[in-house]
From Swiss-Prot:
Keywords: Lipoprotein, Palmitate, Phosphoprotein, Signal transduction inhibitor. Inhibits signal transduction by increasing the GTPase activity of G protein alpha subunits thereby driving them into their inactive GDP-bound form. Activity on G(z)-alpha is inhibited by phosphorylation of the G-protein. Activity on G(z)-alpha and G(i)-alpha-1 is inhibited by palmitoylation of the G-protein. SUPFAM superfamilies: Regulator of G-protein signaling, RGS. CDD domains: RGS_RGS4. A lipid is attached at C2, C12, C95 (S-palmitoyl cysteine). It comes from the Eukaryota. The keyword Phosphoprotein applies. GO terms for biological process: negative regulation of signal transduction. This is Regulator of G-protein signaling 4.
Length: 205
């Protein structure tokens, strides 16, 4: 017959209490981890969770409008990544970041990093530049200034504008945002003022 807890030795009771304490701690830790994980996922999509339909339509007016909007840039980058050709937009972004450098001492190392990654013969993400622009940019590396990539950046922008930007506007990456009602959601059919960018375009996160 079961004698209950009173019949158990003191050492067994202590072990049982220890086990209960450990299990309680692990369960509490698990709940905490799940909460933090859920919170992190929400944080990731808050950047471009909603974008107005008016703004999405502006993306079709010019490449400049598209890539100067945070979610627009993310959508375009995701599209280029799907085509394995994201080096152009990566170069453009790097040039924009480079032009924001305030300290003159940081210009040279950053310029060399961009040059080695996108322009040199052995570049890991070589962009498609004509020989004249490539040579001019190479000369600029002797004494890097804040404008040393301007010509190369302009050429790559024009290249994207004439080619990949036009394909992007015909792709699902843009069309699902421009016409959310096509996704089959009845709620979205009535919501003309804005669209849930995070649900239609996970790559924005």
């Amino acid at each position: 017959m079961c004698k209950g807890l009173a019949g158990l030795p003191a050492s067994c009771l202590r072990s049982a209490k220890d086990m209960k304490h450990r299990l309680g701690f692990l369960l509490q830790k698990s709940d905490s981890c799940e909460h933090n994980s859920s919170h992190s996922k929400k944080d990731k999509v808050v950047v471009c969770q909603r974008v107005s339909q008016e703004e999405v339509k502006k993306w079709a007016e010019s490449l400049e409008n598209l890539i100067n909007h945070e979610c627009g840039l993310a959508a375009f980058k995701a599209f280029l990544k799907s085509e394995y050709s994201e080096e152009n937009i990566d170069f453009w972004i790097s040039c924009e970041e480079y032009k924001k450098i305030k300290s003159p001492s940081k210009l040279s190392p950053k310029a060399k990093k961009i040059y080695n990654e996108f322009i040199s013969v052995q570049a890991t993400k070589e962009v498609n530049l004509d020989s004249c622009t490539r040579e001019e940019t190479s000369r600029n590396m002797l004494e890097p200034t804040i404008t040393c990539f301007d010509e190369a950046q302009k050429k790559i922008f024009n290249l994207m504008e004439k080619d990949s930007y036009r394909r992007f506007l015909k792709s699902r990456f843009y069309l699902d945002l421009a016409n959310p009602s096509n996704c089959g959601s009845e709620k979205q059919k009535g919501a003309k003022s804005s669209v849930d960018c995070a649900s239609l375009l996970p790559q924005c996160a």
